[in-house]
């Protein structure tokens, strides 16, 4: 198992050499510090505790400051454990090149908050008849039998939706920019912009695609039309996509859910 911590920057799109448009999410992956190494003998399970992004020391408690000093690093903002990951020692640095283009990963983050909503949107209830005489349209409906004389704890009711831990599995890594410390992941990932996420090796173990298969995959073979001018793929589309997305989000306000 391998994994890394990052921050969601935003979404963009790139074009493959065969003209396919690929929607991608840019994840900024700064250098991760191995804070602690947990073993089965001492802790009961095997894991690495990773930390990323500096934090003011005045915002860190004394016990936490001691943990960072043991790893010879400054206080960090985002700390997470990744289980069944080994091969590193306390104080080691993990970079974006731990993954390769074509690999499949599982991304875990906190979903966007959507505020207070009704039972139809929150729990996918069916609404009542919308005619004027029905007297029931978008209500909760029956809340239980008469006998308990109360509403049971498990009853699905209106309330807050979002800001929950969500994992999306088997997302493909389209490209890696080691200079800008960025990963381009196919599709969307949970959370708003500037949200911290955990990227781990896909647990279901899909066979990774090689970069040549990824960029030169074609749906079907067609005979070229001599009347249509062939457009060559633009070089550096990955760098351009990363630069544009990073620039667009640099001055954006921080998310409330962070």
Swiss-Prot record:
Pfam families assigned: Ribosomal_L3
Swiss-Prot/TrEMBL GO biological process terms: translation
Key words, A-Z: Ribonucleoprotein, Ribosomal protein, RNA-binding, rRNA-binding
GO molecular function: rRNA binding; structural constituent of ribosome
Transmembrane segments: none
PROSITE patterns named among the record's database cross-references: RIBOSOMAL_L3 (PS00474)
A GO cellular component annotation in the UniProt record: cytosolic large ribosomal subunit
Annotated HAMAP family: Ribosomal_uL3_B (MF_01325_B)
Family recorded in the similarity comment: Belongs to the universal ribosomal protein uL3 family.
Subunit structure: Part of the 50S ribosomal subunit. Forms a cluster with proteins L14 and L19.
Purpose of the protein: One of the primary rRNA binding proteins, it binds directly near the 3'-end of the 23S rRNA, where it nucleates assembly of the 50S subunit.
Protein name: Large ribosomal subunit protein uL3
Gene source species: Spiroplasma kunkelii
């Amino acid at each position: 198992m391998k994994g890394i911590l990052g921050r969601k920057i935003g979404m963009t799109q790139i074009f493959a050499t065969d003209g396919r448009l690929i929607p991608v999410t840019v994840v900024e992956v700064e250098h991760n510090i191995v804070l602690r190494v947990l073993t089965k003998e001492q802790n009961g399970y095997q894991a690495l505790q990773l930390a990323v992004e500096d934090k003011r020391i005045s915002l860190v408690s004394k016990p936490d400051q001691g943990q960072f000093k043991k790893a010879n690093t400054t206080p960090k903002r985002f700390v997470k454990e990744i289980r069944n990951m080994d091969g590193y020692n306390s104080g080691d640095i993990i970079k974006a090149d731990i993954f390769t283009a074509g690999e499949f990963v599982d991304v875990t983050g906190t979903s966007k908050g959507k505020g207070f909503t009704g039972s139809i949107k929150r729990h996918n209830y069916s609404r009542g008849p919308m005619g004027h005489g029905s007297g029931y349209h978008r209500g909760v409906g029956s809340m239980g039998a008469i006998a308990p004389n109360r509403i049971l704890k498990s009853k699905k009711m209106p309330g807050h939706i979002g800001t929950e831990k969500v994992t999306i599995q088997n997302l493909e890594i389209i490209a890696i920019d080691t200079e800008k410390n960025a990963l381009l992941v196919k599709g969307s990932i949970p959370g708003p912009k500037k949200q911290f996420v955990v990227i781990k090796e896909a647990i279901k173990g899909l066979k990774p695609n090689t970069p040549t298969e990824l960029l030169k995959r074609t749906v079907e073979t067609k005979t070229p039309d001599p009347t249509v001018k062939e457009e060559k793929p633009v070089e550096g589309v990955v760098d351009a996509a990363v630069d544009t997305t990073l620039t667009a989000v640099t001055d954006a306000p921080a998310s409330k859910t962070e």
